[in-house]
Amino acid sequence: MKKVRLTREGYEKLKKELEDLKRKFMYEISERIKEARELGDLSENSEYEAAKNEQGRVGSRIMEIEQILSNAEIIEDSEESDEVTLGKWVVIKNLDTGEEHKFRIVTPQEADFFAQKLSSDSPLGKSLLGRKVGDVVKVKAPSGVQRYQVIAVMNK
């Protein structure tokens, strides 16, 4: 598997999720399976089926996170510059509506729109990478082409 680029914050978040899932996997789900087995006939035991399904989902996620972390390359904060790169915060202005938005450009594994983390693989993320303060980018959206100007770029 190729290297997976993550910010330090994203790496730590995945480590915590892995710890939490392992704890859940080892204790909570195992206990639920044990309790469901004690109820008798497993062929018609919906609690047992639900616990086994959750065990499968959690186990898959644990393996996925372990693979990501074992292949992780941490993106360290770079020197202050006005160029948009992975891990940087960027303020953009929609030139059609005048609205300003602030995002952190992150890898797809870390993307979270509600936490203002924009995937570098998204149309907007791709168009912003390598741009500098003052640059204007055009992005195709369902509502048509949107124009954004880079207002600020910062590490934090």
Curated annotation (Swiss-Prot):
One of its GO terms (biological process) is regulation of DNA-templated transcription elongation. Pfam families: GreA_GreB, GreA_GreB_N. Residues 1-32 form a coiled coil. It comes from the Bacteria. Keywords: Coiled coil, DNA-binding, Transcription, Transcription regulation. InterPro entries: GreA/GreB_C_sf (IPR036953), TF_GreA/GreB_CS (IPR018151), Tscrpt_elong_fac_GreA (IPR006359), Tscrpt_elong_fac_GreA/B (IPR028624), Tscrpt_elong_fac_GreA/B_C (IPR001437), Tscrpt_elong_fac_GreA/B_fam (IPR023459), Tscrpt_elong_fac_GreA/B_N (IPR022691), Tscrpt_elong_fac_GreA/B_N_sf (IPR036805). GO terms for molecular function: DNA binding; RNA polymerase binding. SUPFAM superfamilies: FKBP-like, GreA transcript cleavage protein, N-terminal domain. Belongs to the GreA/GreB family. Necessary for efficient RNA polymerase transcription elongation past template-encoded arresting sites. The arresting sites in DNA have the property of trapping a certain fraction of elongating RNA polymerases that pass through, resulting in locked ternary complexes. Cleavage of the nascent transcript by cleavage factors such as GreA or GreB allows the resumption of elongation from the new 3'terminus. GreA releases sequences of 2 to 3 nucleotides. This is Transcription elongation factor GreA. It comes from Thermotoga maritima (strain ATCC 43589 / DSM 3109 / JCM 10099 / NBRC 100826 / MSB8). The gene is greA.
